[in-house]
Amino acid sequence: MKVKRWISLAIAGIIVELLGFALYNHARPFNILALANRFWNWISNNTSMNLGEQRATLYIGAALILLGMFIILFALSRLMQSVTTALTPGNTKDSLVDVIYRNRFLSQGVRVVVIGGGTGLSTMLRGLKQYTSNIVAVVTVTDDGGSSGKLLKQLNILPPGDIRNCLVALADSEATMTELFQYRFYGDGVGEGLRDHNFGNLLIAAMTGISGGDFEKAVQLTSKVLNIRGSVLPSTLQQVRLQGEMEDGSIIEGETNIVASPLKIKKIRLLPFDVEPPEEVKEAIELADIIVIGPGSVYTSIIPNLLVKGIPEALRKAKAKKVYICNVMTQPGETDGFSASDHLRAIQCHTSNRIIDYMIVNTASPSLEMLNKYRKTGSVLVEPDTDRIRNMGVRPIPGNYINQTDVVRHDAVLLAEAIMRLLL
């Protein structure tokens, strides 16, 4: 940051300015007045300038005052630039005043708890962080596929993938750091040990080792690296596996195996079933102004968090408004043929307490071309049956919440605006 350099230069400027004032007022700091007179006499004797010795200190003092002012202003401007760069990495266009105001505004924002996992949760977080930095993301830890699954087996740590996505979504650091965390090793030149691993996952794994196996502390350390707005917590610190009871009564273990099965899911359980959340999770739920559940895969990202002992009870007791965000499209192998009310019913069947007050439901339709593209993969638009939702005791909030690019997904800004309106 070079902060010390500019502070030292500013102090030097102040000293020069004080000496200038001293000379201007004919003071004698360290006999500098006599030196000034000698200097002026030398100039008078060796040049055609002869304005008299009495004016020597006035001219030199004035010159030092101006020089000191220039040094101070230059040092302060560079100091502010360094601080601004540190506070807004990758975005030096904002002034220091703007940065301080924004950070202060966000620090006084509403307290939001977001529960879920996968890409849906990270999308939600990107929108919310524009309104508040008092965000707690509670993330599922049942992923057993890909890089997360390998680290789970090789290092016996909690799967870091979904947590990494949330950390990146909340990051306030420069884009290069975000790209680094999402970088995946692949290709023929990559060794078997690194292939398909994600750099962010490896960093969290390394942080876990540095922290003596403390996964929660590892996530906190990684949060500092990314300078995130808010905090990210696993829904439980114990290793868990998903167990799915399918429509034919068969039992399948493991998230990857459950999703790959052609059979419909009837019930989801956690193994072991009596795991508990960190105390910070229950405390965040208790203090929240609003609690958001989803969006995300209902059986593998949403419900697993609600099966952790203590979380449903904390949600029921919480005074905050509870909002569930329904998915836009059905998910093949998990919610085939589901309407919006079917998503809600799946959650209610897994929780003995009523924990949802509102439900955000998309009513806008993507382009016909996009719908045909998704239909080929077995995914269709979720039917917004708001009347059934209302009959289930939950208030629907219908609207256009989608962002169409190359995929159909929720728009982070529109979702965040809808959430904030509930607090008015």
Where are the regions that the model predicts?
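Electropositive, gly/pro-rich neighborhoods at or near active sites that engage anionic ligands
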Residues: M1-N91, Q108, T142-P262, A418-M420
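An anion/phosphate-binding loop that grips the pyrophosphate of nucleotide cofactors and donors
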Residues: A288
